C-alpha cells in the first residue's frame, strides 16, 4: 500500500500465496494463519500477498490506510498488503484476471468470496486455487513441498 506498482514477476523465484482479503468477514481470522505461514517460511523464499476487496457484501469498506492498520493491530500482519481492488467484473485487477485464467486443469471461474487463495510456484506459474473455507494451515504441506 505504498503507492508503487508491483508486478507478480517481481516475485519470480519465490513461492507466492495471493489472497483477496476483507476485514469484516467470517474468514477474517485467517489473517492470523496467513501471517503464521509468512513468518515461518519467508526466510526460505515464501511470501503472502494480500489484496483487500470490498466486492463481497461490503466487508472491507475502510480506506487502504484503515485496512492496513486493522490488519497490523488485530493480526500482526507483516506480509505485503496492496491497495483495495476488484477481483471480478470489468474492473477486475489484472493480477486476478490472470490468476483466474491460469489454474491448471480448471475452468476459469470468478472469485466466489473473500480469502480465495492462489499458490504460485517459483517459475511464476499458478499451481493451485483454494476456496475461502480452506484454512492457511491446510495449505502448509503444499508450501513445504514446493520449498524442497
Model-derived features with residue positions:
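Extracytoplasmic/secreted proteins, especially bacterial periplasmic and envelope-associated proteins
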Residues: 33-36, 62, 66, 90-94, ...
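Thiol-based oxidoreductase modules, predominantly thioredoxin-like and allied folds used
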Residues: 20, 45-64, 78-89
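N-terminal "domain-start" segment that seeds a small globular fold
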Residues: 1-9, 94
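Thiol-/selenol-based redox modules, centered on thioredoxin-like
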Residues: 94-97, 101-148
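Conserved helix-turn-beta segment immediately C-terminal to the redox Cys motif
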Residues: 9-15, 24, 28-52, 71-75
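Soluble non-cytosolic domains of exported or imported proteins
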Residues: 25-28, 89, 133-134
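Short, internal strand/loop/helix patches
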Residues: 65-114
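Surface-exposed acidic, glycine-flexible loop patches that form ligand/cofactor-binding
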Residues: 7-9, 39-40, 104-110
Amino acid at each position: 500500500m505504498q503507492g508503487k506498482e508491483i508486478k507478480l514477476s517481481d516475485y519470480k523465484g519465490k513461492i507466492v500465496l495471493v489472497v483477496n482479503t476483507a476485514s469484516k468477514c467470517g474468514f477474517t481470522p485467517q489473517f492470523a494463519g496467513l501471517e503464521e505461514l509468512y513468518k515461518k517460511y519467508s526466510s526460505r523464499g515464501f511470501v503472502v500477498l494480500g489484496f483487500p476487496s470490498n466486492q463481497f457484501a461490503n466487508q472491507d469498506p475502510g480506506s487502504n490506510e484503515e485496512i492496513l492498520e486493522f490488519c497490523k493491530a488485530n493480526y500482526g500482519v507483516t506480509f505485503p498488503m496492496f491497495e483495495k481492488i476488484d477481483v471480478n467484473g470489468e474492473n477486475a485487477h489484472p493480477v486476478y484476471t490472470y490468476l483466474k485464467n491460469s489454474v491448471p486443469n480448471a475452468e476459469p471461474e470468478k472469485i466466489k468470496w473473500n480469502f480465495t487463495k492462489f499458490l504460485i510456484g517459483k517459475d511464476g506459474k499458478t499451481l493451485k486455487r483454494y476456496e475461502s473455507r480452506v484454512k492457511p494451515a491446510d495449505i502448509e504441506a503444499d508450501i513445504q513441498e514446493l520449498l524442497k
